[in-house]
């Protein structure tokens, strides 16, 4: 039996790019689609907030010599491209109850995001793919992922990372002795200065107490395991580690 009834998956554009920094990777896309299908088949309702960093990043506006707001608009349209690509792959794999909803109207290819309609679609078994963030510039898709989770009554946010299996006490790519946290509280993340997601998104999650699961999307079955209540990656919630201290991961994963 699933632990969660409804989740929001935060999917970065980099996950779609696979081993490349930009563009698309067909193997990565198929892996993502099959992971989503597995979660749906477990009975969990799924909404997906898709990023666009594999196509364009608004924070690179200076590099291109364009206005930041214009750059963010381009980035939002990049999330539409990724959402349509994901929908196309899911359809090719046999999924037929799919909706792409956008915060910026693109009526020729998707429907506008309307909260109550999105909730209704989830209740009817649709996988809802959410594009364009929340339609506002100066934000990554971290904030809309938490925002949509709260709006849609999701039980948790699953932040899928590509090649990173949780939150560490230091950068594991630089420090081979870096240790991964199994559990953290919101306050522990702040006091330790750990980088989990954009601060505005993290504060929103903390204020409303929605659990965050930071995990490696490349690990097959990780999303489904999390939804069943098995531990993967790092869990951030109101309690954190036992006895008020952050819990470091052990060699064996445990049920949470």
Curated annotation (Swiss-Prot):
<comment type="function">
    <text>Catalyzes the reversible phosphorylation of UMP to UDP.</text>
</comment>
<dbReference type="Pfam" id="PF00696">
    <property type="entry name" value="AA_kinase"/>
</dbReference>
<dbReference type="GO" id="GO:0005737">
    <property type="term" value="C:cytoplasm"/>
</dbReference>
<dbReference type="GO" id="GO:0005524">
    <property type="term" value="F:ATP binding"/>
</dbReference>
<feature type="binding site">
    <location>
        <begin position="10"/>
        <end position="13"/>
    </location>
    <ligand>
        <name>ATP</name>
    </ligand>
</feature>
<feature type="binding site">
    <location>
        <position position="52"/>
    </location>
    <ligand>
        <name>UMP</name>
    </ligand>
</feature>
<keyword id="KW-0963">Cytoplasm</keyword>
<dbReference type="InterPro" id="IPR011817">
    <property type="entry name" value="Uridylate_kinase"/>
</dbReference>
<feature type="binding site">
    <location>
        <position position="168"/>
    </location>
    <ligand>
        <name>ATP</name>
    </ligand>
</feature>
<keyword id="KW-0418">Kinase</keyword>
<keyword id="KW-0547">Nucleotide-binding</keyword>
<keyword id="KW-0808">Transferase</keyword>
<comment type="pathway">
    <text>Pyrimidine metabolism; CTP biosynthesis via de novo pathway; UDP from UMP (UMPK route): step 1/1.</text>
</comment>
<comment type="subunit">
    <text>Homohexamer.</text>
</comment>
<keyword id="KW-0665">Pyrimidine biosynthesis</keyword>
<feature type="binding site">
    <location>
        <begin position="134"/>
        <end position="141"/>
    </location>
    <ligand>
        <name>UMP</name>
    </ligand>
</feature>
<dbReference type="InterPro" id="IPR015963">
    <property type="entry name" value="Uridylate_kinase_bac"/>
</dbReference>
<feature type="binding site">
    <location>
        <position position="72"/>
    </location>
    <ligand>
        <name>UMP</name>
    </ligand>
</feature>
<dbReference type="InterPro" id="IPR001048">
    <property type="entry name" value="Asp/Glu/Uridylate_kinase"/>
</dbReference>
<dbReference type="GO" id="GO:0044210">
    <property type="term" value="P:'de novo' CTP biosynthetic process"/>
</dbReference>
<keyword id="KW-0067">ATP-binding</keyword>
<feature type="binding site">
    <location>
        <position position="57"/>
    </location>
    <ligand>
        <name>ATP</name>
    </ligand>
</feature>
<feature type="binding site">
    <location>
        <position position="53"/>
    </location>
    <ligand>
        <name>ATP</name>
    </ligand>
</feature>
<protein>
    <recommendedName>
        <fullName>Uridylate kinase</fullName>
        <ecNumber>2.7.4.22</ecNumber>
    </recommendedName>
</protein>
<feature type="binding site">
    <location>
        <position position="171"/>
    </location>
    <ligand>
        <name>ATP</name>
    </ligand>
</feature>
<dbReference type="GO" id="GO:0006225">
    <property type="term" value="P:UDP biosynthetic process"/>
</dbReference>
<dbReference type="InterPro" id="IPR036393">
    <property type="entry name" value="AceGlu_kinase-like_sf"/>
</dbReference>
<dbReference type="GO" id="GO:0033862">
    <property type="term" value="F:UMP kinase activity"/>
</dbReference>
<comment type="similarity">
    <text>Belongs to the UMP kinase family.</text>
</comment>
């Amino acid at each position: 039996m699933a632990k969660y009834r409804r989740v929001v998956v935060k999917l970065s554009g980099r996950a779609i790019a696979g081993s490349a920094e930009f563009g698309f990777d067909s193997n990565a896309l198929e892996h993502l689609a099959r992971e989503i299908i597995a979660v749906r088949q477990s009975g969990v309702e799924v909404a997906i907030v898709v990023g666009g960093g594999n196509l364009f990043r608004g924070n690179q506006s200076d590099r291109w010599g364009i206005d930041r707001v214009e750059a963010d608009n381009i980035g939002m349209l990049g999330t539409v491209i990724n959402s349509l690509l994901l929908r196309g792959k899911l359809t090719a794999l046999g999924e037929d109850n799919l909706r792409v909803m956008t915060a910026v109207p693109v009526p020729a290819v998707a429907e506008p995001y309307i909260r109550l309609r999105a909730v209704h679609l989830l209740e009817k078994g649709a996988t809802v793919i959410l594009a364009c963030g929340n339609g506002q510039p100066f934000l990554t898709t971290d904030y809309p992922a938490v925002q949509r989770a709260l709006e849609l009554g999701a039980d948790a946010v699953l932040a899928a990372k590509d090649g990173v299996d949780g939150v560490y006490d230091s950068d594991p790519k630089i420090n081979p002795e870096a240790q991964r946290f199994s559990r953290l509280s919101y306050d522990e993340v702040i006091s330790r200065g750990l980088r989990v997601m954009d601060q505005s998104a993290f504060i929103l999650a903390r204020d409303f107490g929605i659990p965050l699961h930071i995990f490696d999307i490349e690990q097959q079955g990780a999303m489904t395991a999390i939804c069943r209540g098995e531990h993967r990656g790092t869990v951030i919630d109101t309690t954190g580690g036992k006895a008020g201290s952050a819990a470091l991961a052990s060699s064996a994963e445990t049920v949470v």
